[in-house]
Amino acid sequence: EMACLMHDIGNPPFGHFGEAAINHWFNTNLASVTPERCREPNTGIGVIFKHLAQDICNFEGNAQGIRIIHSLQTLNLTYSQSAGILKYTRPAGLDVKDIPQNKNYLMKKVGYYYSEKAFVEALQNELTIEPYCRHPASYIMEAADDISYCLADIEDAIEKGIITIELLCTVLKNHYQKVLINLTIDDTEHQDFVSKAVNYALERGKAQPYNFNSEFFIYLRVALLHPLV
């Protein structure tokens, strides 16, 4: 629960568009504002600046979240709590071409910065997590996030008139049955899971006809989120 509440703590205003704007500005302007003493690659400050330049030219909300909880706000979380929001395992200084083939998904984005490198290494050591691997809780957090924002996107589609609730109910029920066939699940509880959730949400929505759409989605989320996660 803590990981789900905090996983987006590093996102900038305007989300991914904000990330793109920050990266564009630094990649375009960093060279022109870099002090001369930082340009010497073989000096101590030059080496450190190279790492920090890679950080700020690869701004990523997930990595910024690790920086916030550890370096900026010093929230004093446990290693397990911190590992729960470490969604990607690629350090900012690692080039994309150097990513191990079997870790493509976990390292497709920057997961932490040079400033948190020692912290992440200590975390991995204490929790016996192999390099570039995740804590199990982060997988659960990611699944919860995917389910949550997918439902939010569907709700937006209803509000904007792109689809109707009637169509949504039909599609949810039919698609769930197709998924069940592939999973070879035949017990009654799972067979009726989505149908019961949809029917329950419809009943609650009809009880508040002046606010039907909002009521429907409130109870659809309640019925789906926890069981799915």
Regions found by a protein language model. Give the residues of each.
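Sequence-structural signature of the catalytic-core scaffold of metal-dependent phosphohydrolases
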Residues: 1-2, 9-220, 229
